[in-house]
Design a protein with these regions (language model features):
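N-terminal amphipathic/basic leader segments beginning at the initiator methionine
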Residues: 1-15
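Gly/Ser-rich phosphate-binding catalytic loop and adjacent alpha/beta segment
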Residues: 11-32, 41-132
C-alpha cells in the first residue's frame, strides 16, 4: 500500500511506517530543503499515540546525524496546529509532526511543513522521495 497521501505520510505501525522508514523520509526531505552552510531550523513534535515517542526519537537522531549547523526545537507532545504555530513563530525551515491525525491507533506517520508552515503536498512529497 502507498503511505504517501495528499498532505501527509501515514501507514500501519510497524509494518508500513516504522523508525527506519521515518529516518529515510526525513533524510530525503532534509537533503531537498537544506541550504549548505546556513543554519537550518527544524521544529519537531509528536502526538500521544503509543508508537509516537519511538518514532520521534528516531527522527531526532536522523536529523542530528545529517545536519551539523542545526537549531532543533523540540515541541515534544504537541498538537498539529501548535507545531504549525511554532514553525511559523521560530521562522523554521521545516516542521515535522509525528501523527496519523484522525486515523485508528494502529497507524502513525508524518506531517511535514516548510517555511511559514506551508504544508507539503502529495505531489511534492513524491517528487522529494524520488529525488532524495
Amino acid at each position: 500500500s502507498n503511505i504517501f497521501k495528499s498532505y501527509d505520510i501515514r501507514g500501519k505501525y510497524p509494518i508500513e511506517i516504522n523508525e527506519k522508514i521515518i529516518c529515510e523520509i526525513i533524510s530525503s526531505f532534509i537533503s531537498n530543503f537544506r541550504i549548505q552552510n546556513s543554519e537550518f531550523i527544524i521544529v519537531i513534535g509528536h502526538d500521544s499515540r503509543l508508537s509516537s515517542p519511538s518514532l520521534y526519537h528516531a527522527a531526532i537522531k536522523s536529523i542530528k546525524y545529517q545536519v551539523l549547523n542545526i537549531k532543533l526545537i523540540k515541541a515534544e507532545i504537541s498538537t498539529t496546529p501548535m507545531l504549525y504555530f511554532l514553525t511559523n513563530h521560530f521562522n523554521a525551515d521545516m516542521g515535522i509532526m509525528i501523527t496519523a491525525s484522525h486515523n485508528p491507533k494502529e497507524y502513525n506517520g508524518l506531517k511535514i511543513v516548510g517555511k511559514n508552515a506551508v504544508p507539503i503536498s502529495g505531489k511534492e512529497i513524491l517528487r522529494i522521495m524520488n529525488n532524495g
